């Protein structure tokens, strides 16, 4: 959530910056609500002062033996008007709050301005896509030939956009997640966490999925109980660890990592990536989250992105890094890098990680703060998150990049200890 004071005092500038994201801020509505709020607040304050004075005069009139009934009636009337004024203020503030919750984060000055993914800027590449001397198979064909990747049975169980993995491919999927967790905890300084997969609405509001993106979530409603939502990413549960907290500066940075399933309705993805594991309702992801002092968040973004890149480098998978333009960034991000891995069957790079600095946007929604050692006062932390990596898409990349002419799959060197010494699948 943006700073309401910033929105009030720099409304036109905020609107212009949001316009670069393709978001049209309802300036007229905000101005109208602010004008109403000021009018009602001024009237309420004047009425309160008048009521206080009238209450004081009751005692004085009583001492003089005067009839105080008219004064009492005035005080009661003013009390009713005050209550109405406070209710009106609450209504206006509630509408302003809902508006604020629907506004995306402001892009950082270093973010390239653009309308959509076509205007993202490539930052760097690593590795060279392999030139195969045989017809390349996609991961579906590679996995289905032995029955180890079974979309038909998954559809029988759950419908479209689910996968059933068996045998060595299931083991390879598990090996990838274990390798990622070990790398981030042993080499990159993250603390492993096991989090709930079901969260309630305040957690999703804190990280920005609610109220705007409820259609993208799977919701579980039970009569007489608060609704649950299946997490779309462990970013939700990991970041909300600090919700409502005032941290000691010495605790920062906090670095969490978790391997969880993620659940997404893919409401806007009709017709896209209908074959295979690229876009699923349920998929595993290793998620990294950092909670840092404000002055260190952009340095942390470079570190976080490098942590995700290291996974791809050790797996020897070619990839590129993009700086997302203003029109392609996620709702809560002030700056984002996407990592895209080479997928041979599609002859292009596909997203495998998104690493974002959210600034104080999520922290303000969650009221996550730290005590500034210089001032002694609580201030909002900055939050960052990134995939390290999406496990299913990494599996896709490994299957396709390590395939052999006979359909067998070589096991990447770094995964062999997790595969019980298996060197070839198939």
From Swiss-Prot:
GO terms for molecular function: ATP binding; serine-tRNA ligase activity. Keywords: Aminoacyl-tRNA synthetase, ATP-binding, Cytoplasm, Ligase, Nucleotide-binding, Protein biosynthesis. The keyword Transcription regulation does not apply. The keyword Nucleotide-binding applies. Coiled coil: none annotated. One of its GO terms (biological process) is selenocysteine biosynthetic process. It holds the Pfam family tRNA-synt_2b. NCBIfam families: serS. PANTHER family: SERINE--TRNA LIGASE, SERYL-TRNA SYNTHETASE. Consists of two distinct domains, a catalytic core and a N-terminal extension that is involved in tRNA binding. This is Serine--tRNA ligase. It comes from Stutzerimonas stutzeri (strain A1501).
